[in-house]
Amino acid sequence: MKIIAVANQKGGVGKTTTSVNLAACLAARGVKTLLIDLDPQANATSALGLPTIDGHSIYEPLLGGAPISEKVVPTRWEHLWIIPGDLALAGAEIEVARADHHLTRLRAAFEPLRADATFDFVLLDCPPSLGILMTNALAAADELLIPLQCEYFALEGLSKIDHVV
């Protein structure tokens, strides 16, 4: 299982568009793909035509309250599943920050999924900030994809995320 974080601390650079389209392309090729919407705005979730579903975000797995596998929701596309985003993820930043191992909780939550080899790829659609959700995604990821636009502030955001990594 390969985990790819799609991240940039700057908003509006195409993280969600990249995440959703890459997930759809992988699924269309028969690759078992899980898209995790880590953004409280839940745009990846709505892009796939799904509503937010109470209790089905990454919130509880981040806090150790439930395994990731219980939060996976099928989409209408074969080979593509999602863990929807939810506004409650904004509160997860505060709760996870108080927890032990707060920067590696997502990586630990993925261990059972890696062992089961349920998915070939996991794509993490990150929020536009350098907060706890993004740092957990970076710690959990095998690869990092940083979309950016050809403008000064996008490059500035790239240098900030490079410093964090």
Model regions: which residues?
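P-loop NTP-binding core
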Residues: 1-165
